[in-house]
Amino acid sequence: MEIGLTHTSTLTVENKHLAIQAGSGDLEVLATPVMMALMENAAMLAVKEALDEGMTTVGGHISSSHLKPTALGKTITATAVLTGIEGRKLTFKVIAEDETGTIGEGEHLRFIVDRKKFMAKLQ
């Protein structure tokens, strides 16, 4: 695994992605939690192929600003760039954009875990 790994995830805003549907607001605009989930998805996919067999990553923290609204039917992208590696802790810069430019930005932390050991914690 190396600094600079990048992935961009894409989403077309559907009714289920709106703040009024997600319960995070009462307007028909992209919900902040949906934007943040797309950021997490991009980070997860940025490093997926670099992990050893049986390993995955889990989200640990996200700090994000939602800067501009996005309407129903518009396409958004979220790009994650791996900026730091400290043992199992991975740090990403995340940016969300639509056709008008940047709509959100922040930092996301993920942790490398063994799938089986992590899921065993549910027992």
PLM features per residue range, with description:
Residues P33-M36:
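Conserved N-terminal beta-strand and adjoining loop/helix that marks the start
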Residues A43-V47, G84, D98, R110:
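Generic helix-packing signal
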Residues M1-L30:
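Catalytic strand-loop segment that frames the active site of acyl-thioester-processing enzymes
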Residues S64-E99:
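Hydrophobic beta-sheet segments that form the core/acyl-binding groove
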Residues E2-T8, H17, I85-F92, G101-L122:
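C-terminal binding/interaction regions
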Residues M44-T77:
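Hydrophobic beta-strand-centered segment that forms part of the acyl-chain substrate-binding groove
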Residues H7-L11, I62-H66, A80, V94, ...:
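A structural signal for short, well-ordered beta-strand segments
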